[in-house]
Protein backbone atom coordinates (compact mmCIF):
# COMPACT_ATOMS: atom_id res chain seq x y z
CA UNK A 1 0.00 0.00 0.00
CA UNK A 2 1.96 2.98 -1.30
CA UNK A 3 -0.56 5.81 -0.95
CA UNK A 4 0.19 6.87 2.62
CA UNK A 5 2.06 10.13 1.92
CA UNK A 6 0.89 13.53 0.69
CA UNK A 7 2.90 16.63 -0.19
CA UNK A 8 6.28 17.48 -1.69
CA UNK A 9 8.10 19.92 0.62
CA UNK A 10 5.61 19.66 3.48
CA UNK A 11 5.09 15.90 3.57
CA UNK A 12 2.73 13.92 5.77
CA UNK A 13 2.86 10.14 6.10
CA UNK A 14 0.29 8.36 8.27
CA UNK A 15 0.12 4.81 9.59
CA UNK A 16 -2.09 2.67 11.81
CA UNK A 17 -5.46 0.92 11.86
CA UNK A 18 -8.77 1.43 13.63
CA UNK A 19 -8.22 -1.38 16.14
CA UNK A 20 -4.43 -1.42 16.18
CA UNK A 21 -2.22 -0.42 19.09
CA UNK A 22 -1.85 3.16 17.90
CA UNK A 23 -2.13 5.60 15.03
CA UNK A 24 0.86 7.63 13.93
CA UNK A 25 2.32 10.04 11.43
CA UNK A 26 5.61 11.50 10.28
CA UNK A 27 5.61 15.15 9.23
CA UNK A 28 8.57 16.32 7.14
CA UNK A 29 9.33 19.85 6.02
CA UNK A 30 8.20 21.82 9.07
CA UNK A 31 10.48 24.87 9.19
CA UNK A 32 12.64 25.21 12.33
CA UNK A 33 11.94 27.46 15.32
CA UNK A 34 8.15 27.12 15.28
CA UNK A 35 6.95 27.02 18.88
CA UNK A 36 5.09 23.72 19.14
CA UNK A 37 3.70 21.38 21.78
CA UNK A 38 0.86 18.92 22.14
CA UNK A 39 -1.30 21.80 23.37
CA UNK A 40 -1.19 23.33 19.88
CA UNK A 41 -2.48 20.13 18.31
CA UNK A 42 -4.96 18.77 20.85
CA UNK A 43 -7.80 21.29 20.31
CA UNK A 44 -8.33 20.19 16.70
CA UNK A 45 -8.17 16.53 17.72
CA UNK A 46 -10.82 17.20 20.36
CA UNK A 47 -13.07 18.65 17.67
CA UNK A 48 -12.72 15.46 15.60
CA UNK A 49 -12.63 12.75 18.25
CA UNK A 50 -15.54 10.31 18.68
CA UNK A 51 -17.93 10.21 21.60
CA UNK A 52 -18.11 13.96 22.12
CA UNK A 53 -21.85 14.33 21.44
CA UNK A 54 -25.00 12.29 21.01
CA UNK A 55 -24.84 12.92 17.27
CA UNK A 56 -21.68 10.88 16.66
CA UNK A 57 -20.38 7.38 17.32
CA UNK A 58 -20.44 6.34 20.99
CA UNK A 59 -16.89 4.98 20.67
CA UNK A 60 -14.87 6.97 23.19
CA UNK A 61 -11.24 7.79 22.53
CA UNK A 62 -9.14 10.39 24.34
CA UNK A 63 -7.15 10.96 21.15
CA UNK A 64 -4.28 12.40 23.17
CA UNK A 65 -1.39 13.10 20.84
CA UNK A 66 2.22 12.53 21.81
CA UNK A 67 5.09 14.21 19.97
CA UNK A 68 8.01 11.80 19.66
CA UNK A 69 10.56 13.78 17.67
CA UNK A 70 11.36 16.99 15.85
CA UNK A 71 10.74 19.33 18.79
CA UNK A 72 13.42 20.51 21.23
CA UNK A 73 12.88 22.94 24.09
CA UNK A 74 9.43 23.76 22.74
CA UNK A 75 10.51 24.57 19.18
CA UNK A 76 10.66 22.61 15.94
CA UNK A 77 14.16 21.66 14.86
CA UNK A 78 13.49 21.25 11.15
CA UNK A 79 13.76 17.47 11.41
CA UNK A 80 10.95 14.94 11.04
CA UNK A 81 8.15 15.32 13.56
CA UNK A 82 6.82 11.97 14.72
CA UNK A 83 3.47 11.73 16.53
CA UNK A 84 1.28 8.93 17.84
CA UNK A 85 -2.20 8.53 19.29
CA UNK A 86 -2.90 5.33 21.19
CA UNK A 87 -6.17 3.49 20.61
CA UNK A 88 -8.05 2.68 23.78
CA UNK A 89 -11.70 1.82 23.16
CA UNK A 90 -11.59 -0.95 20.58
CA UNK A 91 -14.31 -3.60 20.62
CA UNK A 92 -12.99 -5.99 18.01
CA UNK A 93 -15.52 -8.64 19.01
CA UNK A 94 -18.23 -6.48 17.42
CA UNK A 95 -16.77 -7.31 14.02
CA UNK A 96 -16.53 -11.10 14.24
CA UNK A 97 -19.66 -11.51 12.14
CA UNK A 98 -18.08 -9.76 9.13
CA UNK A 99 -14.78 -11.64 9.18
CA UNK A 100 -15.88 -13.62 6.14
CA UNK A 101 -18.53 -11.22 4.85
CA UNK A 102 -18.30 -7.97 2.95
CA UNK A 103 -20.22 -4.99 4.26
CA UNK A 104 -22.00 -3.39 1.28
CA UNK A 105 -20.73 0.09 0.50
CA UNK A 106 -17.46 -0.38 2.39
CA UNK A 107 -13.86 -1.03 1.38
CA UNK A 108 -14.08 -4.64 2.60
CA UNK A 109 -14.57 -6.13 -0.87
CA UNK A 110 -11.98 -4.05 -2.71
CA UNK A 111 -9.29 -4.43 -0.02
CA UNK A 112 -9.79 -8.20 -0.02
CA UNK A 113 -9.68 -8.41 -3.80
CA UNK A 114 -6.59 -6.20 -4.10
CA UNK A 115 -4.45 -7.48 -1.22
CA UNK A 116 -5.87 -10.93 -0.51
CA UNK A 117 -6.12 -10.01 3.16
CA UNK A 118 -7.82 -7.33 5.21
CA UNK A 119 -8.11 -6.19 8.80
CA UNK A 120 -11.86 -6.52 9.26
CA UNK A 121 -11.84 -4.98 12.75
CA UNK A 122 -13.51 -1.63 12.29
CA UNK A 123 -12.31 -1.44 8.71
CA UNK A 124 -8.62 -1.47 9.59
CA UNK A 125 -6.67 1.00 7.52
CA UNK A 126 -9.77 2.07 5.58
CA UNK A 127 -11.46 3.35 8.74
CA UNK A 128 -11.99 7.07 9.24
CA UNK A 129 -10.15 6.57 12.53
CA UNK A 130 -6.98 7.05 10.47
CA UNK A 131 -7.89 10.69 9.87
CA UNK A 132 -6.96 11.60 13.44
CA UNK A 133 -3.33 11.80 12.34
CA UNK A 134 -4.22 13.99 9.38
CA UNK A 135 -5.83 16.39 11.83
CA UNK A 136 -2.70 16.34 14.01
CA UNK A 137 -0.47 17.14 11.03
CA UNK A 138 -2.96 19.73 9.80
CA UNK A 139 -2.89 21.48 13.17
CA UNK A 140 0.83 22.08 12.70
CA UNK A 141 0.23 23.42 9.20
CA UNK A 142 -2.59 25.68 10.41
CA UNK A 143 -0.39 27.10 13.17
CA UNK A 144 2.46 27.88 10.77
CA UNK A 145 0.11 29.40 8.19
CA UNK A 146 -1.55 31.57 10.82
CA UNK A 147 1.58 32.79 12.59
CA UNK A 148 3.83 33.33 9.57
CA UNK A 149 1.39 34.30 6.82
CA UNK A 150 -1.81 35.36 8.60
CA UNK A 151 -3.74 32.63 6.78
CA UNK A 152 -6.82 31.24 8.52
CA UNK A 153 -8.28 27.89 7.46
CA UNK A 154 -11.76 27.24 8.86
CA UNK A 155 -14.76 25.13 7.93
CA UNK A 156 -18.44 24.64 8.66
CA UNK A 157 -21.22 22.16 7.96
CA UNK A 158 -23.50 23.53 5.26
CA UNK A 159 -25.97 20.70 4.62
CA UNK A 160 -27.21 17.42 6.05
CA UNK A 161 -29.60 15.47 3.85
CA UNK A 162 -31.99 17.97 2.27
CA UNK A 163 -31.54 20.52 5.06
CA UNK A 164 -29.41 23.43 3.83
CA UNK A 165 -28.17 26.34 5.90
CA UNK A 166 -28.70 29.95 4.90
CA UNK A 167 -26.08 31.29 2.43
CA UNK A 168 -22.95 32.49 4.22
CA UNK A 169 -20.82 35.45 3.16
CA UNK A 170 -17.07 35.27 3.66
CA UNK A 171 -16.06 37.78 6.30
CA UNK A 172 -19.45 37.69 8.01
CA UNK A 173 -19.36 34.17 9.43
CA UNK A 174 -19.53 33.93 13.21
CA UNK A 175 -16.77 31.37 13.82
CA UNK A 176 -17.39 31.33 17.56
CA UNK A 177 -20.93 30.20 16.82
CA UNK A 178 -19.61 27.54 14.44
CA UNK A 179 -17.40 26.04 17.13
CA UNK A 180 -19.96 26.34 19.92
CA UNK A 181 -22.41 23.74 18.57
CA UNK A 182 -21.87 20.04 17.81
CA UNK A 183 -22.71 20.48 14.12
CA UNK A 184 -20.06 23.13 13.37
CA UNK A 185 -22.88 25.15 11.87
CA UNK A 186 -23.17 28.98 11.67
CA UNK A 187 -26.95 28.89 11.16
CA UNK A 188 -28.81 28.46 14.45
CA UNK A 189 -32.12 27.69 12.75
CA UNK A 190 -30.52 24.77 10.88
CA UNK A 191 -29.00 23.32 14.05
CA UNK A 192 -32.44 22.48 15.43
CA UNK A 193 -33.42 20.80 12.16
CA UNK A 194 -30.16 18.84 12.10
CA UNK A 195 -30.83 17.68 15.64
CA UNK A 196 -34.30 16.42 14.77
CA UNK A 197 -33.06 14.61 11.66
CA UNK A 198 -30.19 12.83 13.43
CA UNK A 199 -32.45 11.72 16.26
CA UNK A 200 -34.86 10.20 13.75
CA UNK A 201 -32.06 8.45 11.87
CA UNK A 202 -30.70 6.91 15.05
CA UNK A 203 -34.14 5.48 15.81
CA UNK A 204 -34.34 4.04 12.30
CA UNK A 205 -30.79 2.70 12.37
CA UNK A 206 -30.01 4.59 9.17
CA UNK A 207 -27.54 7.28 8.10
CA UNK A 208 -27.39 10.42 5.95
CA UNK A 209 -24.93 12.34 3.77
CA UNK A 210 -23.62 15.85 4.28
CA UNK A 211 -21.87 18.79 2.69
CA UNK A 212 -19.29 21.05 4.31
CA UNK A 213 -17.31 24.09 3.26
CA UNK A 214 -13.73 25.14 4.04
CA UNK A 215 -12.59 28.74 3.63
CA UNK A 216 -8.95 29.84 3.60
CA UNK A 217 -8.55 33.59 4.06
CA UNK A 218 -5.51 35.81 3.44
CA UNK A 219 -3.93 33.37 0.98
CA UNK A 220 -1.41 35.31 -1.14
CA UNK A 221 -1.40 35.45 -4.93
CA UNK A 222 0.76 32.88 -6.68
CA UNK A 223 0.27 29.48 -5.05
CA UNK A 224 -0.11 26.59 -7.48
CA UNK A 225 2.11 24.86 -10.04
CA UNK A 226 0.47 24.51 -13.46
CA UNK A 227 -0.24 22.36 -15.19
CA UNK A 228 -0.49 19.13 -13.20
CA UNK A 229 0.06 20.57 -9.71
CA UNK A 230 -2.53 23.31 -9.97
CA UNK A 231 -3.64 24.47 -6.54
CA UNK A 232 -7.24 23.47 -7.15
CA UNK A 233 -6.13 20.06 -8.45
CA UNK A 234 -4.05 19.39 -5.34
CA UNK A 235 -6.87 20.57 -3.07
CA UNK A 236 -9.31 18.26 -4.85
CA UNK A 237 -6.83 15.37 -4.54
CA UNK A 238 -6.38 15.96 -0.82
CA UNK A 239 -10.07 16.38 -0.08
CA UNK A 240 -11.11 13.39 -2.17
CA UNK A 241 -8.69 11.35 -0.05
CA UNK A 242 -10.93 11.80 2.99
CA UNK A 243 -13.10 8.78 3.78
CA UNK A 244 -16.65 9.00 2.39
CA UNK A 245 -15.99 12.07 0.21
CA UNK A 246 -17.68 11.64 -3.18
CA UNK A 247 -17.43 15.14 -4.60
CA UNK A 248 -15.35 18.33 -4.41
CA UNK A 249 -16.28 21.83 -5.55
CA UNK A 250 -14.02 24.88 -5.80
CA UNK A 251 -15.87 28.18 -5.69
CA UNK A 252 -19.29 27.86 -7.31
CA UNK A 253 -18.44 24.30 -8.34
CA UNK A 254 -21.15 22.48 -10.25
CA UNK A 255 -23.41 25.53 -10.14
CA UNK A 256 -21.32 26.98 -12.99
CA UNK A 257 -23.25 24.71 -15.36
CA UNK A 258 -26.24 27.06 -15.11
CA UNK A 259 -24.22 30.29 -15.15
CA UNK A 260 -23.34 32.45 -18.14
CA UNK A 261 -19.87 33.81 -18.77
CA UNK A 262 -21.07 37.33 -18.08
CA UNK A 263 -22.13 36.19 -14.61
CA UNK A 264 -19.35 33.78 -13.69
CA UNK A 265 -16.30 35.82 -14.64
CA UNK A 266 -14.90 37.63 -11.63
CA UNK A 267 -14.56 41.16 -12.93
CA UNK A 268 -11.77 43.38 -11.60
CA UNK A 269 -11.46 47.07 -10.78
CA UNK A 270 -8.57 49.10 -9.34
CA UNK A 271 -10.08 48.25 -5.96
CA UNK A 272 -10.00 44.49 -6.52
CA UNK A 273 -12.31 41.69 -7.61
CA UNK A 274 -16.04 42.27 -7.85
CA UNK A 275 -16.95 38.64 -7.07
CA UNK A 276 -15.40 35.26 -6.25
CA UNK A 277 -17.17 32.63 -8.31
CA UNK A 278 -13.79 30.97 -8.97
CA UNK A 279 -13.24 30.32 -5.28
CA UNK A 280 -9.92 32.15 -5.09
CA UNK A 281 -8.12 30.20 -7.82
CA UNK A 282 -7.59 31.20 -11.46
CA UNK A 283 -5.62 29.07 -13.89
CA UNK A 284 -4.62 26.79 -11.04
CA UNK A 285 -2.98 29.68 -9.14
CA UNK A 286 -4.32 31.46 -6.07
CA UNK A 287 -5.71 34.91 -6.89
CA UNK A 288 -5.46 36.46 -3.43
CA UNK A 289 -9.17 36.05 -2.80
CA UNK A 290 -10.49 33.64 -0.16
CA UNK A 291 -10.17 30.04 -1.27
CA UNK A 292 -13.50 28.24 -0.97
CA UNK A 293 -13.77 24.46 -1.21
CA UNK A 294 -16.87 22.35 -0.61
CA UNK A 295 -17.06 18.59 -0.22
CA UNK A 296 -19.93 16.10 -0.32
CA UNK A 297 -19.79 13.06 1.95
CA UNK A 298 -21.85 9.95 1.39
CA UNK A 299 -24.04 8.39 4.10
CA UNK A 300 -22.06 5.75 5.95
CA UNK A 301 -22.90 2.17 5.06
CA UNK A 302 -22.43 1.09 8.68
CA UNK A 303 -26.10 0.92 9.61
CA UNK A 304 -28.21 -1.57 11.52
CA UNK A 305 -30.67 -2.11 8.67
CA UNK A 306 -29.93 -5.53 7.10
CA UNK A 307 -28.28 -5.44 3.69
CA UNK A 308 -27.58 -8.00 0.96
CA UNK A 309 -24.00 -8.96 0.21
CA UNK A 310 -21.68 -11.92 -0.39
CA UNK A 311 -19.08 -13.80 1.63
CA UNK A 312 -15.52 -14.82 0.78
CA UNK A 313 -16.88 -17.75 -1.22
CA UNK A 314 -19.13 -15.53 -3.32
CA UNK A 315 -22.30 -16.82 -1.66
CA UNK A 316 -25.28 -14.59 -0.93
CA UNK A 317 -25.49 -13.45 2.70
CA UNK A 318 -27.25 -10.86 4.81
CA UNK A 319 -25.14 -8.33 6.70
CA UNK A 320 -26.21 -6.43 9.79
CA UNK A 321 -23.55 -3.99 10.94
CA UNK A 322 -22.71 -4.07 14.62
CA UNK A 323 -20.24 -1.84 16.39
CA UNK A 324 -20.48 1.90 17.01
CA UNK A 325 -20.85 4.28 14.11
CA UNK A 326 -21.73 7.84 13.13
CA UNK A 327 -25.23 8.48 11.73
CA UNK A 328 -23.63 11.31 9.71
CA UNK A 329 -19.88 11.21 9.11
CA UNK A 330 -19.95 14.78 7.85
CA UNK A 331 -20.32 16.17 11.36
CA UNK A 332 -16.83 15.16 12.46
CA UNK A 333 -15.30 15.77 9.03
CA UNK A 334 -15.00 19.55 9.41
CA UNK A 335 -11.60 19.53 11.19
CA UNK A 336 -10.42 16.79 8.82
CA UNK A 337 -11.20 18.91 5.76
CA UNK A 338 -9.57 21.94 7.36
CA UNK A 339 -6.45 19.86 7.97
CA UNK A 340 -6.19 18.67 4.37
CA UNK A 341 -6.60 22.20 3.00
CA UNK A 342 -3.95 23.51 5.41
CA UNK A 343 -1.51 20.74 4.47
CA UNK A 344 -1.85 21.56 0.76
CA UNK A 345 -1.54 25.32 1.31
CA UNK A 346 1.62 25.05 3.40
CA UNK A 347 3.18 22.68 0.89
CA UNK A 348 2.47 25.12 -1.93
CA UNK A 349 3.68 28.10 0.10
CA UNK A 350 7.02 26.42 0.69
CA UNK A 351 7.25 25.53 -3.00
CA UNK A 352 6.37 29.11 -3.95
CA UNK A 353 9.08 30.53 -1.68
CA UNK A 354 11.64 28.11 -3.09
CA UNK A 355 10.88 28.99 -6.71
CA UNK A 356 9.57 32.54 -6.92
CA UNK A 357 10.75 34.67 -4.01
From Swiss-Prot:
Q: In which pathway does it act?
A: Metabolic intermediate biosynthesis; chorismate biosynthesis; chorismate from D-erythrose 4-phosphate and phosphoenolpyruvate: step 7/7
Q: Which GO terms describe its molecular function?
A: chorismate synthase activity; FMN binding
Fetch the InterPro entries from UniProt: Chorismate_synth, Chorismate_synth_AroC_sf, Chorismate_synthase_CS
- Give the matching CDD domains: Chorismate_synthase
Q: How is the cofactor bound?
A: Reduced FMN (FMNH(2)).
GO annotation, cellular component aspect: cytosol
One GO biological-process annotation of the entry reads: aromatic amino acid family biosynthetic process
Q: Where does FMN bind?
A: 125-127, 243-244, 283, 298-302, 324
Binding of NADP(+) occurs at 48, 54
Q: Basic and acidic residues: which segments have biased composition?
A: 37-49
State the SUPFAM superfamilies in the record. Answer: Chorismate synthase, AroC
Q: Mind listing the UniProt keywords for this protein, alphabetically?
A: Amino-acid biosynthesis, Aromatic amino acid biosynthesis, FAD, Flavoprotein, FMN, Lyase, NADP
Q: Which cofactor does it need?
A: FMNH2
- Record region (Disordered): 37-60
Q: What is its EC number?
A: 4.2.3.5
Catalyzed reactions per annotation: 5-O-(1-carboxyvinyl)-3-phosphoshikimate = chorismate + phosphate
Cited NCBIfam families: aroC, PRK05382.1
Please give the family membership noted in the entry. Belongs to the chorismate synthase family.
Write out the function statement from the record.
This reaction introduces a second double bond into the aromatic ring system.
The protein's assembly and partners: Homotetramer.
Indicate what this protein is called per its UniProt record. Answer: Chorismate synthase
Amino acid sequence: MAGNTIGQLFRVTTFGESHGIALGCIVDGVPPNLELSEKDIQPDLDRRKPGTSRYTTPRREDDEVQILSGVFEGKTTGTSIGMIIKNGDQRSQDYGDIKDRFRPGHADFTYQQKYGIRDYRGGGRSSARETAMRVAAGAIAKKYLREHFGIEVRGFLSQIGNIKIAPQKVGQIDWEKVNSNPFFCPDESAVEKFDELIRELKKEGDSIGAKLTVIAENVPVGLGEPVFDRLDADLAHALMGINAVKGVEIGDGFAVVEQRGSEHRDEMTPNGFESNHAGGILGGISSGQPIIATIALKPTSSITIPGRSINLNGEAVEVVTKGRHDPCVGIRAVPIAEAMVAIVLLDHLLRFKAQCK
